[in-house]
Structures are given as C-alpha cells and as structure tokens.
Amino acid sequence: MADILKSVKRIVVKVGSSILVDNQEIAAHRIEALCQFIADLQTKYEVILVTSGAVAAGYTKKEMDKSYVPNKQALASMGQPLLMHMYYTELQKHGILCAQMLLAAYDLDSRKRTINAHNTIEVLISHKVIPIINENDATALEELVFGDNDRLSALVAHHFKANLLVILSDIDGYYTENPRTSTNATIRSVVHELSPDDLVAEATPNNRFATGGIVTKLQAAQFLLERGGKMYLSSGFHLEKARQFLLGGSHEIGTLFYSRVSS
C-alpha cells in the first residue's frame, strides 16, 4: 500500500459532524487531535481541510428546530465562527495559519469561480497556510439537507488537484455487511469499483447532526473513481490508523478506493 502514496503530493482531509460534536458539546479534544494530525501531515503533504459541523456547533449555543431549514442555516451561521476559532487556536500551537473558504457546489460548476477558488488555494498552500473549506450553509441547501460535505469534499479534491481524499468519519470503513446488524461484517481493505446498488442504498447517519451516511461517502468515492482519483475512508475517532497509513504506509484498517487504472 505504500506504493499508492508515492504519487500523493496533495490531500484533502474531510471531517464529519459526528467527530466534531459530542453530547451537544463541541468535542475540543478531537479538534485538538485533528489539528495535531494535520500538522504532522503537513510535514509530508500539502493539506486542504474540508470541515462539517457548523450546524452542530451552533446548536451547542442555541437550540432550534433543525427540521426548519432557515433555523438550520442560522445555526450554521453561528457555528462556523466557533469552529474556525477552535481550528485557528489549535493550529497556532503548531505554528500553522489557517484560512476560511466557504463554497457551495454551484461555485464549482462555474469555470470562472472554480479558477478563482483554485488560485486562492494555490496561494495559501504556497505559504503553508491550511485552507479550511466548508459548505456555505447560510445560502446553500443541497449539502445542508443531505451529504455532510462528502460530495463537496470529492469536488474539492478533483478541482483543486488533490491526489487523495481522506474522509475521517464515525464510519471506519466500507463493510461487507452492516456492522450494526451482522457479526460477520468485515471492512473491505481495498475497493476498485462500486455497483449501482451500492450507491442508492438507504443512508443511515449515526449522529443526529450528520446528514450523510455510508452512501454519500460511496458516492464521493465513485465520483473520484470515475476520474482516476483515490479516496481513503477511516475513523475520525481513532486517528492512529489513518496516521499509520498516511505517515507510515501501513494499511491495517479503513478502506482505500482506487481504480486499477489509476494505481
């Protein structure tokens, strides 16, 4: 598996809401661990972070009915600066600056807007600044309702020339069966292709604030597979496995998606 990483120069790390918030509180210890991990990754790779969690972070300060979309957008508006403050504070401990970029999927549908965003990313990375991208939840709807930024992270990886998308989630890999209902379920180590049925199964997000599930992660993987890209799905609760793979080249757990052609 170490050979897969030889050509990897730039990675997108996407972290889900369920990692960032725990029991209606921002999980400061996980953000601290994540920022330590990002600092370590930056010694080997160019790193772009795609974060979820703005709605969940906002809810920790003001409870609202999230089934009403304007409330959800208001929560995102409150939560985003909370997240950025924590990222900024923790990354500063490692001498790293970060920058906020709020995007929507339609920003990447426009060639002009994509080029503008790409140019900004390149300048930030050239100065060792970590771009932190989130969906512009205050105005966008699609990812806010369903996706938890999984699809956005795949678009970011593709359009901003990353060699690998790393999704850190409460789902620690792509299982042969549902691990919550089957004791025989095992994690697939490598996946080269996905079937149409894999991409339309019912999504069952584990966290009340998460809007995705395994299906949106598989859809992100499929998007990249079709374009010769790679994706690695691993636990965001226990970063040592992702660390072993990305920094040590040892693939013990988690699922790596790549086409045989791209390998």
Swiss-Prot record:
RNA-binding listed as a keyword: no
First-tier enzyme category under EC: transferase
Function as written in the Swiss-Prot or TrEMBL entry: Catalyzes the transfer of a phosphate group to glutamate to form L-glutamate 5-phosphate. May be important for growth and survival.
Lineage: Eukaryota, Discoba, Euglenozoa, Kinetoplastea, Metakinetoplastina
Domain of life: Eukaryota
Pathway this chain belongs to: Amino-acid biosynthesis; L-proline biosynthesis; L-glutamate 5-semialdehyde from L-glutamate: step 1/2
Residues involved in substrate binding: S52, D137, N149
Reactions listed under catalytic activity: L-glutamate + ATP = L-glutamyl 5-phosphate + ADP
SUPFAM superfamilies for this protein: Carbamate kinase-like
Transmembrane helix keyword on record: no
Co-factor requirement: Mg(2+)
GO molecular function term, any single one: glutamate 5-kinase activity
Positions annotated to bind ATP: K14, S169, D170, T211, G212, G213, I214, V215, T216, K217
Assembly information from the UniProt record: Homotetramer; oligomerization is not affected by L-proline feedback inhibition.
Pfam families the UniProt entry points to: AA_kinase
Family statement drawn from the similarity comment of this UniProt entry: Belongs to the glutamate 5-kinase family.
Organism: Leishmania donovani
HAMAP family according to UniProt: ProB
Activity regulation details: Inhibited by L-proline as part of a negative feedback loop. Also inhibited by L-proline analogs 3,4-dehydro-L-proline, L-azetidine-2-carboxylic acid and L-4-thiazolidine carboxylic acid.
Keywords assigned by UniProt, alphabetized: Amino-acid biosynthesis, ATP-binding, Kinase, Magnesium, Nucleotide-binding, Proline biosynthesis, Transferase
GO biological process: L-proline biosynthetic process
InterPro entries for this protein: AceGlu_kinase-like_sf (IPR036393), Asp/Glu/Uridylate_kinase (IPR001048), G5K_ProB (IPR041739), Glu/AcGlu_kinase (IPR001057), Glu_5kinase (IPR011529), Glu_5kinase/COase_Synthase (IPR005715), Glutamate_5-kinase_CS (IPR019797)
GO cellular component assignments: cytosol
Enzyme Commission code: 2.7.2.11
Protein's recorded name: Glutamate 5-kinase
